[in-house]
């Protein structure tokens, strides 16, 4: 269920929306073609911020105001190079992507970020399907 919920965060992001998963001292979110801007924080040293490319390729990735900074980087879903970063005490931070979808995890004591996008998104998530799946295995009780 955890992975499916992360997939849902990416789906929301790809439609110009944002969601936050809270649990076990961490928050997970996603951003597509946009940025997360965190206000000044007071996060304990050693609490991790991690950024992963949900897209096959994410272009123009930037991380500023963190222990390790990058600018205009290309990230892929098959190479882990955005893990175990940290907020700087008292500093604002920025995580952005020009094109692609990033999954971002950060400590729950960090302020929730302001979210911005580079363009508007069209469409919605579609209609709600309430039918029982045809993939459901049906076992009838056998009489004895």
What name fits each language-model region?
Residues 24-26, 30-143:
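Long, charged alpha-helical interface segments
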Residues 1-37:
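Anionic-ligand-binding alpha/beta catalytic cores of soluble enzymes and soluble regulatory domains
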């Amino acid at each position: 269920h955890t992975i499916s919920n992360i997939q849902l965060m990416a789906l929301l992001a790809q439609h110009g929306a944002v969601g936050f998963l809270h649990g076990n001292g961490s928050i997970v979110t996603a951003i597509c073609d946009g940025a997360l801007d965190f206000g000044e924080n007071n996060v304990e040293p050693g609490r991790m911020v991690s950024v992963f490319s949900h897209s096959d390729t994410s272009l123009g990735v930037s991380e500023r105001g963190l222990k390790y900074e990058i600018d205009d980087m290309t990230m892929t879903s098959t190479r882990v190079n955005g893990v175990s970063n940290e907020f700087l005490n008292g500093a604002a931070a920025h995580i952005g992507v020009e094109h692609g979808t990033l999954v971002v995890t950060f400590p729950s004591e960090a302020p929730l970020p302001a979210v911005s996008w580079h363009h508007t998104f069209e469409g919605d998530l579609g209609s709600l399907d309430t039918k029982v799946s045809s993939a459901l295995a049906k076992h009838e009780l056998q009489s004895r």
